[in-house]
UniProtKB/Swiss-Prot annotation:
Pfam families referenced in this protein's UniProt entry, alphabetically: Acetyltransf_CG (PF14542)
Family: Belongs to the NATD1 family.
Protein name (Swiss-Prot/TrEMBL): Protein NATD1
Domain of life where this protein originates: Eukaryota
Domain (N-acetyltransferase): residue spans on this chain: 18-108
Gene name as annotated: natd1
Amino acid sequence: MAHSVLDSMDPSSSIRVEHDRKRRQFSVRLNGCHDRAVLLYEYVGKKTVDLQHTEVPDAFRGRGIAKHLAKAAMDFVVEEDLKAHLTCWYIQKYVKENPLPQYLERLQP
C-alpha cells in the first residue's frame, strides 16, 4: 500500500503554499508532484481580487490544507493592499472563523 507524504505528517508540520501569480493560484503539492490542492483567484478590478474556488483532492481532505491556502490568499490580499470578494464558500468560512481586522477591512460585498 502506497503512503503519501502527508500520511506521515503530524498536524503541526508546515505545509508549503506556492503562489503562482501568472496562473492566479495558490497551491500545495501533495503526494510528490502529481496531486495538488489549489485556490484560484481573478482580478476583477485594478486593486480587487475575487477568491473564487478552493479544491483539495478527496484523499487529502480534513487535514487543514484548505486552511493554509485560505490564509495564504488572505495574507496576499493584506500584503498587496487589495480588496477581496469572496466567491468561494470555504474562504468565507475561513474569514468568519478568523475575523482578523486586517482581513475584514478588505472585504467587498
